[in-house]
Every structure is written in structure tokens, then in C-alpha cells.
Design a protein with these regions (language model features):
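Proline-threonine-serine-rich low-complexity tracts
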Residues: 1-176
Length: 176
């Protein structure tokens, strides 16, 4: 049973952003209680070098989006009518958990569920226009860590191309 939780910000600590102190007791079926147990956790600072940027969704990578999929609502759109990040990819945080066996974990950084770790993740699309049958967007992701009266920013800029891959088809039911 959690009795108390104290969150202490560690301003300007080079390694940690917060100390979380939790006090617990255990209670059995006969209502007997244990002594108070205190658990202290230090939250490490966000390491921007562990960010994995989304891949380009472009012809060059073989991962361009098909305009037919947009037309038939097979690709979700964001509030501005652009392909939604849940479909095109979001920045990930790659972490290594040291134990046996070694565990590699990736965590989606968007949408940010809270700012408990002093980070914010946002994106903005820049419309590069249409060239021939290719519509291009440059998606600018900003991953910000606030620390010690300043901030560190990591930027990811994947390219998103929407391509018309199919020629028109004309069906002539009668001979001309």
C-alpha cells in the first residue's frame, strides 16, 4: 500500500532530473501491517543521442505513400490533412536495460503522455509542393529537453512523398 510519494526536482544535476521517494507498507488478510519500506528512485536525464529518427517515406527508400491510399482513406490524416505520424513514423527512444539477458527497448516519443521527464516532442510539416505526380512534405520533429534553465534540442527531418503510381485507365465498352 502506497503511503506517501515525494518528488524532488534535481535542478542542474548532470545525471538525474528527479528523485522519487515512495513509502509503502504491506497488509495481510488478518490486517497485520509490515514496517514502512522506503524506495528511492533517481530518474536519469533524457539522452538525445538515443533518439532514433523516423525513416524517409520517399521514392528513394521505396517507402513513398500512394495517393490512392489517401484518396480511399486507408491512411489516417492529422488535423491539417497530412499523413498522420502514427502511420508515417515517430521518433523513438532507444534504451538499453543492463541485465541478463541484455534487453533493448524502444519507446515512442510522440504523443508525449506527460512532461515528467522534462521533454516535449512536437512536429511541423513544411509543404514542398507538387512536382509532377509527387507531393512532398518535410516533417520537422523537435525533441526538447529542459534542463538547468536551458534546453537541448534534437531535430529529425524525414521526407514524406505521396506518389501517383498508376496511369489512368480508360475502358471503352464499344468499338469506335
Amino acid at each position: 500500500i502506497l503511503l506517501d510519494e515525494i518528488i524532488q526536482p534535481l535542478n542542474c544535476d548532470p545525471n538525474y532530473i528527479k528523485r522519487v521517494i515512495k513509502k509503502y507498507i504491506a497488509r495481510d488478510a488478518y490486517n497485520n501491517t509490515s514496517a514502512v519500506c522506503t524506495d528511492t528512485t533517481l530518474l536519469e536525464r533524457f539522452d538525445t543521442s538515443r533518439v532514433i529518427c523516423p525513416e524517409d517515406r520517399a521514392l528513394a527508400t521505396g517507402k513513398a505513400l500512394n495517393c490512392k491510399d489517401l484518396r480511399y482513406n486507408r491512411i489516417p490524416l492529422d488535423s491539417k490533412g497530412h499523413p498522420h505520424p502514427s502511420f508515417t513514423g515517430v521518433p523513438l527512444y532507444h534504451d538499453t536495460i543492463l541485465r541478463s539477458p541484455l534487453v533493448l527497448d524502444t519507446i515512442a516519443l510522440w504523443p508525449v503522455r506527460d512532461i515528467y521527464c522534462n521533454i516535449a516532442v512536437t512536429y511541423e510539416d513544411i509543404d514542398l509542393g507538387r512536382i509532377g505526380c509527387v507531393q512532398k512534405y518535410m516533417r520537422m520533429w523537435s525533441i526538447r529537453e529542459w534542463w538547468c534553465n536551458g534546453e537541448r534540442v534534437r531535430t529529425c527531418i524525414p521526407l514524406i512523398e505521396i506518389v501517383d503510381r498508376e496511369a489512368p485507365y480508360v475502358h471503352c465498352p464499344y468499338p469506335i
